[in-house]
Each structure stands twice: as structure tokens, then as C-alpha cells.
Amino acid sequence: MSESLHLTRNGPILEITLDRPKANAIDAKTSFAMGEAFLNFRDDPELRVAIITGGGEKFFSAGWDLKAAAEGEAPDADFGPGGFAGLTEIFDLDKPVIAAVNGYAFGGGFELALAADFIVCAENASFALPEAKLGIVPDSGGVLRLPKLLPPAIVNEMVMTGRRMSAEEALRWGIVNRVVSQSELMESARELAQQLVNSAPLAIAALKEIYRATSEMPVEEGYRYIRSGVLKHYPSVLHSEDALEGPQAFAEKRAPVWKGR
């Protein structure tokens, strides 16, 4: 694993800290290491939730390492099987990822956060996609994911002028889940992670699968698709041990014990 990444396991929760000099910028080597971490998280049955954050209090990540670019790393370089920053192109991840944004999330750093399922950010966090000002485009998900979250006028301004969005504005638009003080950031992210651990893993996997499959469908078509039998997790969860455990635990007034099957 790269020395720029610090991995910490807390039971079923994996914390990934990106810690590189010069604004936690990401080059191809670091991106490969991040991809390895996320793919291992995906495939580890003992892990349920991942938290990705940046080292320090100023930068979550400034995105692509422009020093590496100046030294010849191409915008379309191979950044690994998970895409840029290791997460932006993993499309079969059925476990939740929380981005704990501790500061500036610019370019690929913002795209990394957008690839997560939840964003918890510090009050000093700021978001931007300044690629057009550098002669490139935010093609690691920014130009694809942001239009699903914001009105066209706001998206156009952000991607074409690189204008920054504050943490509070991001909260108003619903891009982030929580805004907390810098000192409370990781505590808040861990609290959310524990809430996710308390939910049944198969149910969460089914929800993520349904979101991916039906997000562009009309509601009626989505209903038919869900019930067509083509999904992997949805039919399984309906007949799982966990589906029996949930109601039984509720009736017995105790916490459910999920088995993931």
C-alpha cells in the first residue's frame, strides 16, 4: 500500500486517509493505491462501510497532481481499475462510502467526494471543478454526476468558470449531508457509519443496486424492472435470514443481529 494512504479498520468500518504533501493531490501511482484499497473494501465480507478523508485541515484533495502533469503524466493516463482516485469508476460497489471532506475539494477531489454515497464536511470545506481553466474537463465523474444534483445554471457556472461552492451552499443544494466543525468531522462521519452498520447489509446492497439500475427510468418502468428478477440482491433480500431477523428483533425489543444472508 502507498505511504500516501493510511488505512484504519474499526470493526466493520474502514477509514482511508489520503495524506500527500502539496494539497493531497493525486497522481497515477496514488490513484492505483486508492483503487486497491476500495476494491479490497468491496471484496472483504467483514467490512461494511468506508470513510475517505484527507490528511490535515486545509485540503480534502486538490485533485489531479499538476506537478505530475507537468512532468508528463497525461490527463488520460491509466489511473487504475477504480478510475481516478480509486472510486470514481467502481460501479458495482454495494457498500456505502462516506466522504469526510476536511477542506478544499477541488477538481478530482470533488469528483471523489461525488462518487461517495454520503458527504460530511467541515465548515471550512469548499468545492470546485476548475478543470476548464486548466484546459481540461472534469471527466472523472464531475461533468456526469453534478448535473444530477444541481440545476443546469449552477452546473454550467461551476464547470465552465470554476466557481467555488461553500459548505453551507452545498448543504442548501443537498450535495452534502452534514456540515460540522473541523473538530467534529470524523466523529460525525463515524456516527453516520455506525448508523449504516446498524442497517442490514443485504438491504443496503439491494438499495444501491436498485438506485443504479432505475435512476433514469420512469417510476412505472422501475417497478417492472425491480420485479423482473434480473437484479441480484433484491430477490435475495426478500427471502434472506436477515428479512426474518428484522421483524423478530423488533417484536422481541432487541437489536437485530445481521448475518448478511
UniProtKB/Swiss-Prot annotation:
Q: PROSITE patterns of this UniProt entry? A: ENOYL_COA_HYDRATASE
Q: InterPro entries, per this entry? A: Carnitinyl_CoA_dehydratase, ClpP/crotonase-like_dom_sf, Enoyl-CoA_hyd/isom_CS, Enoyl-CoA_hydra/iso, Enoyl-CoA_hydra_C
Q: Enumerate the Gene3D superfamilies for this protein.
A: 2-enoyl-CoA Hydratase, Chain A, domain 1, Lyase 2-enoyl-coa Hydratase, Chain A, domain 2
Pathway info: Amine and polyamine metabolism; carnitine metabolism
Q: Name one GO biological process term.
A: fatty acid beta-oxidation
- SUPFAM superfamilies recorded for this chain? ClpP/crotonase
Give UniProt keywords alphabetically.
Lyase
Q: Give its E.C. classification number.
A: 4.2.1.149
Show the active-site residues. Answer: E111 (nucleophile), E131 (proton acceptor)
| Superkingdom in the source lineage | Bacteria
**Could you tell me which CDD domains the record lists for this protein?**
crotonase-like
User: Which PANTHER family does this entry report, sorted A to Z?
Assistant: ENOYL-COA HYDRATASE, MITOCHONDRIAL, ENOYL-COA HYDRATASE-RELATED
Protein family (similarity comment): Belongs to the enoyl-CoA hydratase/isomerase family.
Q: What is this protein called?
A: Carnitinyl-CoA dehydratase
**What species was this sequence derived from?**
Salmonella typhi
Q: What is the lineage of its organism?
A: Bacteria, Pseudomonadati, Pseudomonadota, Gammaproteobacteria, Enterobacterales
